Design a protein with these regions (language model features):
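Helix-loop-strand module that forms the ligand-binding subsite of alpha/beta enzymes
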Residues: 1-78
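Glycine-rich phosphate/pyrophosphate-binding loop and the adjoining helix
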Residues: 74-119
Length: 119
C-alpha cells in the first residue's frame, strides 16, 4: 500500500459511513500511515515527497452527520501529501439509489473533472 501511495498522482478515499465515521476496515489499512506521521512530526522528514491530489467519497444509508467521517478522511489524505479537491457525500442510500440521484451524479462528474485537470 505504501509504495502505491508514493507513486500515484491522485488518491480517492471512499467509504460508507457507519456510526458517523469511515469504516473500521479503512481505518485499519490507513493505520499504516503512522510511519508517515512519525516521519513528518518526529523525524522532520517529508514522508511522501510527490505531492498529489485527492478526493473523498462518502455514502450513508440515513441522513446522519458527515463531519466526523469527512474530517477523518481529509486528515488521512493530508498524511499522504494530498491536496483535497473536495468531498461527495450521498445520504439516504437505503431509500434512494445513487443512480436515481442526478445531483450526486453531477457532483461526481464535477469532482472527476477537477481530478483530471489537477497538476
Amino acid at each position: 500500500v505504501l509504495s502505491y501511495i508514493e507513486e500515484c498522482d491522485h488518491i480517492i478515499m471512499a467509504s460508507p459511513v457507519y456510526f458517523e465515521e469511515v469504516t473500521g476496515m479503512l481505518l485499519a489499512v490507513m493505520s499504516r500511515l503512522q510511519t508517515y506521521f512519525s516521519a513528518r512530526y518526529i523525524r522532520k522528514e517529508e514522508p511522501v515527497p510527490k505531492k498529489k491530489t485527492g478526493a473523498v467519497l462518502l455514502t450513508a444509508g440515513s441522513i446522519g452527520p458527515r463531519e466526523k467521517a469527512e474530517s477523518t478522511a481529509e486528515m488521512l489524505l493530508r498524511q499522504m501529501s494530498c491536496d483535497s479537491l473536495g468531498t461527495v457525500y450521498v445520504n439516504r442510500t437505503d431509500k434512494v439509489p445513487v443512480r436515481d440521484r442526478e445531483d450526486i451524479i453531477q457532483e461526481i462528474k464535477d469532482l472527476a473533472g477537477r481530478l483530471r485537470t489537477a497538476e
